[in-house]
């Protein structure tokens, strides 16, 4: 049986299917994630050199267990080659990675479905389309096993925040749809049930901020850490994901991109709402040094640390404790 499993894995690899690495807390009960966002890479454009430089520097400095790209990865044709080239920066280092889409990725001559296949095909990719029948492309949940490998110790929800509003009379960006929220709630309930009725500590990653980011940032009682140079370009309509998060009691933090001049984090009803740091170069607007957000999870606790890593070093080190 074991030999057969090895042959099957080898056969799949030879057909071009990437093996899916497992995620697990380290023996020190830590697990580190690097979030790259808004690379806006233009094919063979020198202005994107600094994006690759920063990714490599952050990976050298942080040595993460997982990298998550939160959208707007590519910004020119040829789309498939461009996407593959960006993701190989991580894949070639044998670091597990996953992606969610931004509102610009499918504007470069390829569909999200085509781009997803590129991401899925690379070694060390955990990118998936777990539920193709619901809205968006690339909604999936990643599990991080406990250091002893006996249970799911953390869940990472990767969600497509879609692109632009399709409702007549409603301008601006789209929202996470009801069927996507229903999927998250179903998965959350399943993980909670399998964990003896206790919600599994979780994080959520997508591109476009929730409306609650603006609410939290403008609340005089909320402590905001980091840079806020622009209002969150959130959907005009609130579809209720944050309410579902509070009802389920599992997600400790929501991590987004999209707004290049923001990298702040603010706790809102005991959920950290946080931007990544813009990782790209001057192919798009940017008024702060590029970098990345880092998240370090603690096994068996609703606590984590997060900080920004730039060329200059570490900024905004925040120890976060979420009250159940």
Question: What do the PLM-derived regions correspond to, one by one?
Answer:
Residues 34-52, 73-81, 107, 113, ...:
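Acidic/histidine-rich helix-loop elements
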Residues 17-89:
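N-terminal active-site segment of His-dependent metallophosphoesterases
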Residues 63-65, 155-157, 170-263:
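His/acidic metal-ligating clusters that form di-metal
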Residues 22, 27, 36, 141-146, ...:
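Binuclear metal-dependent phosphoesterase catalytic core
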Residues 84-197, 293-298:
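Extended active-site neighborhood of metal-dependent phosphoesterases/phosphodiesterases
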Residues 30-43, 153-163, 205, 272-278:
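Active-site-proximal beta-strand elements of phosphoester/diester hydrolases
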């Amino acid at each position: 049986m074991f030999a057969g499993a090895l042959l099957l894995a080898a056969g799949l690899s030879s057909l071009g299917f990437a093996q899916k690495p497992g995620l697990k807390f380290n023996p020190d009960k830590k697990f580190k994630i690097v979030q790259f966002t808004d690379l806006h890479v233009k094919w063979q454009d020198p202005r994107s050199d600094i994006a690759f430089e920063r990714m490599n520097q952050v990976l050298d400095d942080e040595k993460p267990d997982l990298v998550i790209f939160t959208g707007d990865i590519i910004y020119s044709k040829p789309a498939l080659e461009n996407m593959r080239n960006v993701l190989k920066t991580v894949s070639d280092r044998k670091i597990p990675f996953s992606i969610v889409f931004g509102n610009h990725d499918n504007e470069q001559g390829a569909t999200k479905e085509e781009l997803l296949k590129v991401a899925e095909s690379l070694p060390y990719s955990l990118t998936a389309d777990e539920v193709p029948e619901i809205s968006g492309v690339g909604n999936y949940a990643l599990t991080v096993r406990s250091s002893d490998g006996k249970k799911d110790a953390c869940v990472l929800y990767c969600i497509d925040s879609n692109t632009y509003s399709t409702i007549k009379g409603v301008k601006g960006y789209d929202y996470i749809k009801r069927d996507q929220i229903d999927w998250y709630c179903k998965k959350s309930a399943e993980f909670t049930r399998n964990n003896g009725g206790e919600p599994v500590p979780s994080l959520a990653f997508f591109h476009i901020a929730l409306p609650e980011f603006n609410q939290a940032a403008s609340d005089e009682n909320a402590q905001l850490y980091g840079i806020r140079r622009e209002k969150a370009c959130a959907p005009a309509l609130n579809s209720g994901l944050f309410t579902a998060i509070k009802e389920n009691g599992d997600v400790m933090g929501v991590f987004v991109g999209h707004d290049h001049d923001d990298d702040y984090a603010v706790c809102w009803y005991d959920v950290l709402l946080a931007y990544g740091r813009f990782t790209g170069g001057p192919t798009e607007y940017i008024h702060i040094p590029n970098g990345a957000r880092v998240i370090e999870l603690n096994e068996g606790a609703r606590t984590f640390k997060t900080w920004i890593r730039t060329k200059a070093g570490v900024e905004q080190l925040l120890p976060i404790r979420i009250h159940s």
